[in-house]
């Protein structure tokens, strides 16, 4: 057999073994498939676990949204003390992500845009006995539409839990009213 054929077969064997070893490796591949974000930071896992806890317990959560000229006022609460505590953890954690630009759910167009404009948003958070009251505003009309659309989606998370969280959410159109 000519040397080039043996080299070709040997290269093929090495390629096959490399793929086979990777296919059966204990650790998942490090390639990011879905997300477009900056990757995990030191608080990502804790934030995700809190979000998943809230989605799992969505039926124990109540939420009201009041549209304002420059944003929204929301009250998100639960009669369950454990759920109320998680709401009080989740909201300021997400505000920190807004301010830092280190968002989550970049695969979801609305969330990507929300975090893109996070520095143009002002948020006042106050704990209630059973959760949080938030006033979120902006001086930018486009950002106000994003804030209001985000509030609607969060209300859908409360209503439907994981069913809604697995969906992508479109950006509000410029013609949408406040």
Where are these regions (language model features)?
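Bacterial N-terminal signal peptides
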Residues: 11-22
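A low-complexity, Ser/Thr/Gly/Pro-enriched, surface-exposed linker/loop concept
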Residues: 27-58, 82-119, 154, 158-172
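Terminal, regulation- and interaction-focused segments at domain boundaries
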Residues: 27-33, 66-82, 130-131, 135
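Short, solvent-exposed interaction modules
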Residues: 109-139
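Short, well-ordered, aromatic-rich surface patches in folded extracellular/luminal domains
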Residues: 127-164
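Short, solvent-exposed mixed-charge patches
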Residues: 176-178
């Amino acid at each position: 057999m000519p040397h080039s054929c043996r080299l070709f077969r040997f290269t093929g064997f090495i390629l096959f073994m490399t793929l086979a070893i990777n296919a059966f490796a204990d650790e998942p591949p490090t390639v990011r498939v879905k997300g477009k974000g900056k990757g995990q930071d030191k608080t990502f896992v804790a934030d995700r676990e809190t979000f998943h806890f809230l989605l799992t317990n969505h039926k124990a959560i109540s939420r009201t949204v009041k549209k304002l000229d420059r944003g929204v006022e929301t009250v998100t609460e639960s009669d369950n003390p454990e759920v109320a505590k998680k709401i009080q953890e989740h909201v300021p954690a997400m505000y920190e992500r807004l301010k830092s630009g280190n968002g989550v759910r970049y695969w979801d167009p609305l969330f990507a845009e929300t975090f893109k404009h996070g520095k143009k948003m002002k948020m006042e958070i106050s704990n209630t006995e059973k959760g949080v009251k938030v006033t979120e505003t902006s001086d930018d009309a486009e950002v106000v539409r994003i804030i209001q659309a985000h509030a609607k989606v969060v209300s859908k998370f409360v209503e439907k839990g994981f069913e809604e969280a697995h969906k992508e959410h479109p950006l509000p159109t410029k013609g949408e009213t406040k």
